Amino acid sequence: MELVPSARAELQSSPLVNLSDAFPSAFPSAGANASGSPGARSASSLALAIAITALYSAVCAVGLLGNVLVMFGIVRYTKLKTATNIYIFNLALADALATSTLPFQSAKYLMETWPFGELLCKAVLSIDYYNMFTSIFTLTMMSVDRYIAVCHPVKALDFRTPAKAKLINICIWVLASGVGVPIMVMAVTQPRDGAVVCMLQFPSPSWYWDTVTKICVFLFAFVVPILIITVCYGLMLLRLRSVRLLSGSKEKDRSLRRITRMVLVVVGAFVVCWAPIHIFVIVWTLVDINRRDPLVVAALHLCIALGYANSSLNPVLYAFLDENFKRCFRQLCRTPCGRQEPGSLRRPRQATTRERVTACTPSDGPGGGAAA
């Protein structure tokens, strides 16, 4: 199997989207066989493409449907009145965008070429980076939000408001645009070995900027946010162990601890799913390893697929960890357009005359971001 040039080739591509172009020294060019002649394909390459397509199809179906249900449920039932719900909506939006690109990537694997043109190439590559940064930034802010709710309940009344949460979400997308827009500009389609590839074209020297990009992504989309999250949960753990009642109400405390656990599990799932590919990319870039080893190549594909799988995992976690989300999902599936059935899925709760509160909300408390 003829291998394409080294990782410092003049044209580099995204490490997380167009996988066969991400690390050119490891993957065969489209249509290359063992003798180097175009037009043939090995059985192992075809089997890998079929396996990836099947996996991506499942991730796309579960992730797109699940995240759309999350967004619709939040808008329909909570009117975005709580800080936690607003952050969850932002996370679901980023995940839905990421899973929407998987059909294009599956087609690229099966066809061994990029048939969708440069405009979609730019969209797919930039969405990948937008998802990466908006997801971890949102999870970081959710952890900070939990820290303030647990450790500074008085300050939470002022900080954890819907308006401020929406403003923070806007800032998250603006910060992510600092990476997403340059990626969109650098994304190009280029002919290679009789096929078309969608890749990133870095300025000269391309190998230098490619390495700098990978290191910056590793630091700012993984290491630094994880450190902030770790500090927040470390301080929360100390607080939860030292104080029996955080809010003066046992019911409110149970809600507070339940939401904190849910956010921690979602953050943990993100770390488990994304740590392998981040570490793999850094090792691949900085360490001299055998990039032609089939096991290394297979491990890389597995790590990338695991990162994408995280986008379909969050709605499942919400359904299992939060009873209100579970009831909300059931109602959305049973009732056309999410209309509330009289008496269904409701428990006795206090509600103001200005806002009708239903049970189909994350357990964040009614009507305000500081409730829990």
Curated annotation (Swiss-Prot):
The chain crosses the membrane at residues 48-75, 86-110, 123-144, 164-186, 207-238, 262-284, 300-321. GO terms for biological process: adenylate cyclase-inhibiting G protein-coupled receptor signaling pathway; adult locomotory behavior; cellular response to growth factor stimulus; cellular response to hypoxia; cellular response to toxic substance; eating behavior; negative regulation of gene expression; negative regulation of protein-containing complex assembly. Its main location: membrane. It is found in: Cell membrane. SUPFAM superfamilies: Family A G protein-coupled receptor-like. Residues 76-85, 145-163, 239-261, 322-372 are cytoplasmic. Disulfide bonds join 121-198. A lipid is attached at residue 333 (S-palmitoyl cysteine). Pfam families: 7tm_1. One of its GO terms (molecular function) is G protein-coupled enkephalin receptor activity. Residues 340-372 are annotated as: Disordered. Belongs to the G-protein coupled receptor 1 family. G-protein coupled receptor that functions as a receptor for endogenous enkephalins and for a subset of other opioids. Ligand binding causes a conformation change that triggers signaling via guanine nucleotide-binding proteins (G proteins) and modulates the activity of down-stream effectors, such as adenylate cyclase. Signaling leads to the inhibition of adenylate cyclase activity. Inhibits neurotransmitter release by reducing calcium ion currents and increasing potassium ion conductance. Plays a role in the perception of pain and in opiate-mediated analgesia. This is Delta-type opioid receptor. It comes from Mus musculus (Mouse). The lineage of its organism: Eukaryota, Metazoa, Chordata, Craniata, Vertebrata.
